[in-house]
Amino acid sequence: MLDLEVVPERSLGCEQWEFILGMHFSQAVCIMQSQVNNIKKVQVIYNEDDPLASDLVLSLTHDGIRLLFDSVSQRLRVIEIFNMNMVKLKYCGIVFSSPEVVPTIDQIDHSFGATHPGVYDAEKKIFTLNFRGLSFVFHVEQACEPRYVRGLGSLQFTNGSSPVASKMYIFNGNSLIDSKPPPLPISCFFSHPYLQNLEVLRHNNATLGVKLSLLCEGPSQVLEPRRHSCVQELKFGSSVQDVLSLLGAPSRVFYKAEDKMRIHSPQAHLRAPALFSDYFYNYFTLGLDVLFDGKHHRLKKFVLHTNYPGHYNFNMYHRCEFNLHLPARSPSAEATRLIDLSPTFITVTAYSRWDEVCERVQHSSRPIVLHRSSSTNTTNPFGSTFCYGVEDIIFEVMPNNLIASVTLYAAEEVAIANSKSDLR
């Protein structure tokens, strides 16, 4: 049985680890992987058809704990104890719920002190006791009319006993219903940069690079670290040194063994095998990959990841909050006779639906089907995705119409121009 400390409006944990409100989904998963001997079973629950419609949930079924993550930010919003009998809970070092200590209303009152009168739902027969950042739920079979005169003790029940808490919630703010995840805590930065948003830089219908708004740990102030934000630009043709100086060391370096999309290139059979292996810098906390040319070590491709559940790479990256402006499809000849339309653009984000995007942009008519598998697992339980080309961009689309990734390629003249400007 887990022995955990409750910190209202903040966390649930022990000396070795803790689940902190505002932490990213992947960080919670990392904790569970490190505690595999103590946390036996975990379920991932999400809406397969529309992952943005409801919370992303990690359920520790053998420990009575559920972690509810905001579907957009993928940060921890609510910590729920759905079975008080499966975990030992303490507050300020004093146990208030365990096999030996029953979490009655009187016990909660003794451990946490006075609060506002609770709320009784006669229809559901539920009594809820609220503190700031903390709520307890009690199932009550039958209650007399509550008289809130002297605090909790004024609530009377027919059999004279004190109801036992069946659930507990830890959240940010005063209201569980309106709770939202706080910003990523400084204690969860671990010296990594995090992405606030990314803008794709384009000119004359060609992609030039990306502009990143980053958040990282700044200089300490009175022994307390603080957040530091900055804006960086990366363009095609940038050197490895440029990328390292702007983004820092990557989370991982991956060398390409082969180009599986090469077969779709014109006259692919005439191309000589590459003597140098291209390589990726993977920035997991930015939701970004950058590909370098193996011969000249110049940046030639960006990959932006949206990290939706149901995708093969889910939980590997944080979501890349990108903005991409594309020219809208030209109106029909009949429409142009009636009105003179200036060139218009549409904005594509990590939350855009492909069926809405493809109606307004000129894309490749037939998609390429992408089957993903690893060397140790030749089956992909999430199924295939579909790749569509739009100018110098490839959109990877999931069966539910959400965009899984966006790949930005460099036009040769852009990459050459940028690399030459670096040499001047």
Language-model features, listed with the residues they occupy:
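Short helix/turn-capping signatures at newly exposed starts of structured segments
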Residues: 1-424
